Swiss-Prot record:
Record keywords: FAD, Flavoprotein, Glycoprotein, Membrane, Monooxygenase, Oxidoreductase, Transmembrane, Transmembrane helix
Subcellular location: Membrane
GO biological process per UniProt: terpenoid biosynthetic process
Gene3D superfamilies, alphabetized: FAD/NAD(P)-binding domain
Annotated metabolic or biological route of this protein: Secondary metabolite biosynthesis; terpenoid biosynthesis
The organism's taxonomic lineage, starting at the top: Eukaryota, Fungi, Dikarya, Ascomycota, Pezizomycotina
UniProt source species: Penicillium rubens (strain ATCC 28089 / DSM 1075 / NRRL 1951 / Wisconsin 54-1255) (Penicillium chrysogenum)
EC number from the UniProt entry: 1.-.-.-
Coarse class of the protein's main subcellular location: membrane
Protein name: FAD-dependent monooxygenase adrH
Cofactor: FAD
Its membrane topology: Single-pass membrane protein
Length: 451
């Protein structure tokens, strides 16, 4: 009888020990769904200089899994943001504090390595996480699927989830230096800086004990596509930061200060895009494997975690629709189509907002430069409402209890937005156009001074 039960056990093979991959492993573990994680690297949590922002839409899912408290202990809530411009003008906003008050989850930043450590250390059965296994082949076998690794190992299951990122013909218009620095006098924990330059931006988050997480995004000379996108070395990161060392990002803090105090830094090309195909037979992809975005709005990891919540919920529902038999390939395909139908538009909306954010922050046109400098601070209410409305529509795992914080947060009046990112910004652009209509000379003057 035990052998019969084992024969009918549905198994998920997760390719990639990423944040998305390990979060899915935790979700499946909570549902008692058999699974393994195959990771190509020798260790799950290497220090690569990257960091992530955790927003309420990602935090609520990690909280459902019992992981958020460990993460929160390593962070300082962001409560205030400062924005600065090339002409030394600046202003501040308490939008992060408002988000914290609304959702009971703050915006926080921490090392990607630390997030992976928390996910790994809190995972209940580490024998399910297999490292040093680079996938070389995927086989579809009709009633099952197999993953073959470079050393000849074969792992057989019923569903393969790609959570390790892929290289494909996505566009590359920006390069980014990610860095983590020691405390810098003048940068206070719980604050965050956006410096909008011409064709570049510098964004910092100041975490627990003064640890500074930062990135510099530089617009490239042209649009590239993989595999022709530039590749960068540590020397390239040093060269870019050296050229920008005197750029003042806030008060008397410069890019040079970030670089001199760095603990680790790396440089990479930023791929942007969202795929139309999310699954094939028994194979499905999520997170960075299906949508890639710039870090400007801090939603890359959070969007991946939402993918996990929806996919795990659907897998669990499908399996329990018939407890005696494994789901057929047809059932699996139907489930994966539903996964895409539920996640495609939200992910696309986030991708579009991220894409716009990169171009807005780097002032890649004179109109964006003018709106950022002269209009942006006066439409804070619009930005706040749009942000809260978007976050309030975040997905959760449907077979786990909703966190208590969600029930006490004041977000019930906000429903998932049906508007596109372009429509969400209509008021911003209308305000800007009105400015030029009332002051016709302003457009030509600013165009000549900014260009």
């Amino acid at each position: 009888m035990a052998d019969s039960m084992e024969t009918h056990k549905f198994k998920v093979i997760i390719v990639g020990g990423s944040i998305a991959g390990l979060t899915l492993a935790h979700s499946l573990s909570k549902a008692n769904i058999d699974h393994i994680v195959i990771e190509k690297r020798a260790e799950i949590a290497p220090q690569e200089g990257a960091f992530i922002g955790v927003w309420p839409n990602g935090a609520q899912i990690l909280d459902q899994l019992g992981l958020y408290q460990s993460l929160e202990e390593l962070t300082a809530p962001i409560s205030r943001m400062h924005l600065s411009f090339p002409d030394d003008y600046s202003f501040s906003s308490f939008l992060p504090k408002t988000i914290h008050e609304r959702f009971k989850y703050p915006i926080v930043s921490l090392d990607r390595q630390k997030v992976l450590e928390i996910l790994f250390q809190n995972y209940p059965d580490k024998s399910n996480i297999i490292t040093n296994q680079r996938v070389s082949e995927v086989r579809l076998l009709g009633d099952s699927a197999s993953v073959v690794t470079e050393d000849g190992s074969v792992f057989r299951g019923d569903l393969i989830v790609g959570a390790d990122g892929v290289h494909s013909p996505l566009t590359v218009e920006y390069a980014c230096v990610f860095g983590i620095s020691r405390p810098i006098p003048g940068l206070r924990s719980g604050e965050h800086i956006n410096h909008y330059g011409d064709k570049f931006c510098v964004i910092t988050f100041h975490g627990k004990d003064g640890r500074v997480f930062w990135f510099i995004i530089q617009k490239l000379d042209r649009v590239y596509t993989y595999p022709n996108a530039p590749r960068y070395s540590p020397n390239d990161a040093a060269d870019l930061c050296g050229k920008m060392q005197n750029v003042v990002i806030w008060q008397d803090i410069t890019v040079g200060d970030l670089w001199k105090t760095k603990v680790v830094a790396s440089m990479t090309a930023l791929e942007e895009g969202i795929f139309e195909t999310w699954s094939l037979n028994r194979i499905v992809i999520l997170g960075d494997s299906v949508h890639k975005m710039t870090p400007n709005i801090g939603q890359g990891a959070n969007t991946a975690i939402e993918d996990v919540a929806v996919l795990a919920s659907l897998i669990n529902r499908m399996i329990h629709a018939d407890d005696l038999n494994k789901p057929s390939e047809s059932c699996i395909e139907t489930m994966l189509q539903e996964y895409k139908s539920l996640r495609y538009e939200p992910a696309k909306s986030t991708y579009q907002r991220s894409r716009f954010g990169a171009r807005f922050h780097t002032r890649d046109s004179w109109l964006k430069a003018v709106v950022g400098r002269y209009v942006f601070q006066y439409v804070g209410g619009l930005i706040e409402n749009r942000t809260i409305k978007t976050l309030a529509g975040g997905d959760t795992i449907d077979f786990l209890p909703r966190p208590d914080r969600l029930e006490t947060g004041r977000v019930a009046q906000f429903q998932k937005s049906e508007e596109s990112p372009q429509r969400q910004w209509t008021l911003l652009w209308v305000s800007s156009l009105a400015l030029f209509l009332f002051f016709p000379w302003l457009g030509s003057y600013l165009h000549s001074t900014i260009s």
